[in-house]
């Protein structure tokens, strides 16, 4: 008789525009991860689908969820609230299903501090350069230069939290970045060897923040 295993949790965080949402969708499709759908008080972006990409709610609804202690994690990002409700995540993990989170460093810290009895692997995604990040943000649905400038300021602060993650991956090529994350997840699950150069990452962060 086989012993049922609990699912694992994988967190992907990154500065805005570094590509984590695309990577989360790839991992969900190719590695059978359930994407944890966050609640948010911001308005939908172009091509975002309610109840698939996010649960779009007003501030009162969000505050009620906080009051009722329904969030596994929540944070304020760019003047909007984001949060992950506990029950859907725990239900999936207990059934042996894996869950992947697209959240920022604040949410990642909260989940780590909860010390849940499930395996957790955390990744921080970096752009290859500040110039490429600026280009990505400018080409997205952000025609307002002030918004792009705000994102770049936040980047300088957010990137400092890389040290709190298990792995930091540079997204200079989407397929290669996905492959690295996928291999590291497999190695973590199977207790295999992990090809990861932390000194190289440290030097890259120093270059990004100089």
UniProtKB/Swiss-Prot annotation:
What keywords is this UniProt entry annotated with? ATP-binding, Cytoplasm, Kinase, Nucleotide-binding, Transferase
Enumerate the InterPro entries for this protein. GK/Ca_channel_bsu, Guanylate_kin-like_dom, Guanylate_kinase, P-loop_NTPase
Q: Which SMART domains match?
A: GuKc
> Which parts of the chain are coiled coil?
none
Q: Name one Pfam family in it.
A: Guanylate_kin
Localization, per the record, is: Cytoplasm
Q: What does it catalyze?
A: GMP + ATP = GDP + ADP
Which EC numbers characterise this protein's activity in its record?
2.7.4.8
* Residues the record lists as binding ATP: 14-21
- Outline the extent of the Guanylate kinase-like domain: 7-186
Output one GO MF annotation: guanylate kinase activity
Q: Which GO terms describe its cellular component?
A: cytosol
Question: Which family does the record assign?
Answer: Belongs to the guanylate kinase family.
The UniProt entry, under HAMAP family, shows: Guanylate_kinase (MF_00328)
Function noted in UniProt:
Essential for recycling GMP and indirectly, cGMP.
What is the protein's given name?
A: Guanylate kinase
